[in-house]
């Protein structure tokens, strides 16, 4: 995680030296996004009383959907609040010593406040590239394990940070398209068993996603 954050931070700082976009189109906007979410393998720590064990989780791709409301200033900066749901699948995890097993998903809902900076590297008056970062509150993180008709779920809340980069293209005076990449990092989340599921799981949550969206300025 630290290496990924370091690389993204360097890229963010370098982008601030690029040519800014200071067009006089300040004002509010709304954006709706959808995308393909992914997550690298994670270590899951399972605890049940005095019993503790560890397992490795391998995750497949999944989906992301959400929206944001923001305001763009006339100096290249904008700020926004967003809500996002994302989920990735796993084909089967086994946590020994009485831990859960089976296939399922690893999902979250979150709200965030993002700060973003726009600059011009595409040379088009209609296009704006951007980078940014956000503070994230995970209103729920949930991992499910399904075997047949039986399901065990573990959930919790947490905080994290996210890094964003992308581009926007105007398709009219108010409408625009958006394409971007995002990475979220939340460490050592405590996920409690639900509905009689035994024990607790401690895990990192580090999804990344490629997104497309459409927005409207007001």
Predicted regions and their residues:
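Transmembrane beta-barrel architecture of outer-membrane proteins
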Residues: 62-65, 108-112, 158-162, 176, ...
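Outer-membrane beta-barrel translocator domains and adjoining extracellular loop/strand segments
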Residues: 42-50, 91-99, 141-150, 189-198
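Gram-negative (and chloroplast) outer-membrane scaffold detector with strong preference
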Residues: 24-27, 34-40, 68-146, 205-218
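Predominantly the C-terminal beta-signal and adjacent terminal strand-loop region
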Residues: 43, 83, 87-92, 163, ...
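Surface-exposed strand-loop-strand hairpins of Gram-negative outer-membrane beta-barrel proteins
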Residues: 37-65, 154-159
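Short, conserved structural micro-motifs that define repeat-unit consensus positions
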Residues: 66-72, 166-170
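Cleavable N-terminal export/targeting peptides
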Residues: 1-27
